[in-house]
Amino acid sequence: MRLDKFLVACAVGSRTEVKNLLKAGRVTVNGKKEKSAKLQIDEERDEIRFDGQVLEYEEFVYYMMNKPQGVISATEDPKHRTVLDLLDDIARSKEVFPVGRLDIDTHGLLLLTNDGQLAHALLSPKRHVDKTYLAQVKGIMTQEDVEIFAKGIPLKDFTCQPAILELVSIDTEKNQSQIRVTIAEGKFHQVKRMVAYCSKEVVDLQRLTMGTLVLDENLQRGEWRRLTKEELEILLASIA
């Protein structure tokens, strides 16, 4: 691996910043100052230090994002901003991608990583990873709807697995409901279509959880952070 790529991967700085830091003599390789960005290193064996601190290479990274509306859950899109546009240069340099998708008008929890094995495990239909959503609904959801969700709703192209519908609040004067829905699948517009089957309409949808991950309530829309060590350990254990 090139030295500059290693330094960027260790969050020392952007590619341009790293070159300047190398020129300034702030990086050593095996005890010797190194100024060549193109130097090939062995990230497992060589000791690389920045300002005297030993750097450790991170192969995989994991970010939690509170995805805002109006942004595409993809790595690139010709028309819209993507979730990668919300990251900084260092995070983007890790070549992360979103695990699954949230519709452009859906907001909430999104996991981004460069760990393909983890992503595959979380998205595998065999694992039935639960996802919980909070929805604002035009119309009054009822106990009958709760039972319909529990049986598995037959949509035009597939039958949903049994889902949990919780009635959070009902406002008969405004003819609206707030509900919490937990599903094991993640088909296109699934929650909206399930609610529409009950003759109501989702007007706002937020994802709260995915597997063991819970959206950090301190993250504002459009903000992101690394998973904590505890969050990552619990997540990895859940798919082991």
Regions found by a protein language model. Name each.
Residues 1-240:
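Basic, flexible Lys/Arg- and Gly-enriched helix-loop patches that mediate nucleic-acid binding at interfaces
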